[in-house]
């Protein structure tokens, strides 16, 4: 019978880079960083978590284009806690650090290349993180700003009754906060549909009851449209 004990890797590596060091391409040469990068694909969530912490603590996540790319691939990680940490790391890498310094251009360019091509699965993963950890909203908005087509995926979520009420609400909110103006017509149609059904329900009390999702989301749709239409 196989043992149930899970091997937890140990990464021994001091912080690789100080704030004054912006050279990239050397982080991958350090054994601890390389081992941690490989463990990002480990099927055991706790191992992936330790690997991610190592890459952040050594500074490699902000310095190495390869490491930043590998971290970005975990945006669809099934573990919500780990995915939330990925969002925080990536969002922070796209902003100045405590000293006001940006990550190397090679890192931001690599992230822009990957994040600009996000699909529904990654976008949905970001919305789930927002529901789970609302305090990560700035990082999520920063990431979505890079993906010009994310608005299309978000409006699909907002329209889908298969999604939970909170997912739909957060999708609508993100559309307004990032500023996806192309989503205005779809939101207007959603508003008209909701208002028409509400009016019909009020004039015909014998009609089937309105879904709670639609009635509850109408204020969110109106608020989003107000923000998107403002100068």
Give the residues covered by each predicted segment.
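N-terminal "cap/leader" segments of large eukaryotic alpha-helical scaffolds
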Residues: 2-42
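HEAT-repeat alpha-solenoid elements in large eukaryotic scaffold proteins
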Residues: 6-17, 41-51, 98-103, 127-133
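Amphipathic alpha-helical scaffolding segments comprising HEAT/armadillo-like alpha-solenoid repeats
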Residues: 27-39, 61-76, 95-128, 147-159, ...
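Short inter-helical turns and helix N-cap capping residues of alpha-solenoid HEAT/ARM repeat scaffolds
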Residues: 43-44, 78-79, 119, 133, ...
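Non-membrane alpha-helical segments in proteins
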Residues: 46-57, 69-72, 84-92
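Eukaryotic acidic, Ser/Thr-rich intrinsically disordered low-complexity regions
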Residues: 199-231
């Amino acid at each position: 019978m196989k043992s149930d004990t899970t091997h937890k890797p140990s990464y021994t590596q001091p912080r690789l880079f100080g704030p004054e060091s912006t050279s990239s391409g050397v982080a991958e040469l350090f054994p601890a960083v390389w081992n941690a990068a490989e463990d990002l694909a480990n099927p055991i969530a706790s191992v992936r978590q330790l690997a991610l912490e190592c890459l952040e603590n050594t500074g490699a996540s902000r310095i190495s284009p390869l490491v930043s790319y590998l971290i970005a691939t975990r945006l669809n990680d099934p573990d919500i806690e780990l995915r939330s940490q990925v969002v925080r790391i990536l969002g922070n890498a796209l902003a100045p650090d405590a000293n006001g310094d940006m990550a190397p251009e090679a890192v931001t360019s690599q992230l822009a290349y990957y994040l600009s091509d996000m699909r529904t699965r990654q976008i949905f993963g970001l919305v789930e993180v927002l529901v789970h950890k609302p305090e990560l909203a700035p990082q999520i908005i920063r990431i979505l700003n890079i993906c010009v087509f994310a608005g299309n995926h978000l409006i699909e979520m907002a329209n889908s009754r298969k999604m939970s009420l909170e997912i739909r609400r957060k999708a609508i909110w993100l559309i307004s906060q990032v500023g996806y103006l192309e989503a205005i017509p779809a939101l207007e149609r959603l508003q008209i549909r909701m208002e028409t059904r509400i009016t019909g329900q009020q004039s015909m009390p014998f009609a089937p009851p309105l879904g709670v999702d639609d009635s509850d989301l109408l204020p969110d749709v109106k608020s989003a449209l107000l923000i998107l239409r403002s100068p």
